[in-house]
Amino acid sequence: DPEWSHLSLVYDILMHIVLSVRIESAIRKHYISGTFITHLIALFDSPDPQEREYLKMVTHRIYGKLTNRRAAIRRAINQTFYTFLYETRHHRGISVLLEILASIINGFTLPIRPEHRQSLEKSLIPLHKMAQYEEYSVQLSYCMALYVEKDRSLSAPIVRGLLRYWPTGNSTKEILFLNE
């Protein structure tokens, strides 16, 4: 892709800004705003898998370095899931966003906060109903397992969700559900 050399340069500069110890934290916080995060997460719908991988790396670094932007990242990811579920029904980066979310879930402290539980129930569990489920089933299953590992009581809403979205008549998807 001829554009990739330019895009990779932009992402390298952004990564440098995020990681640099020479740039004051206040400046980073000012420019990497909630709106910036929303636009960054929207880029995960890129048709280029290489760009999505770069975005994943940048998002991980922002999440780790700018703790005050963590909630904005989680909100933007959830909003992307909502848009995918209830509006567009198409998104190229759901599996990559689930990979990011898995590392975020892994860092959750106990007890699980109500906002994280709501994310599970309102955006993650409904992802099972989508026709594209097979494209991201491994990553979604891993997120479900991490939630249960953190709090066993969350297995009940997950099982109820699987039963609610059971893919009757789609044997391939049924097998994926059983494996989960």
Whereabouts are the PLM-identified features?
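Core helices of alpha-solenoid repeat scaffolds
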Residues: 28-38, 70-78, 94-97, 112-124, ...
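Asp-box/WD-like beta-propeller blade repeats and closely related beta-sheet repeat scaffolds
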Residues: 25-48, 56-62, 80-84
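Eukaryotic helix-linker segments that join adjacent hydrophobic helices
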Residues: 1-42
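Histidine (H) residue identity feature
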Residues: 6, 16, 30, 39, ...
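Short, flexible active-site loops
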Residues: 159-164, 180
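Short coil/turn segments at helix-helix junctions and helix-capping linkers
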Residues: 1-5, 39-51, 68, 83-92, ...
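Amphipathic alpha-helical elements of HEAT/ARM-like alpha-solenoid repeat scaffolds that form extended
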Residues: 6-18, 53-60, 91-106, 134-148, ...
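Internal metal/ion-chelating core segments
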Residues: 56-118
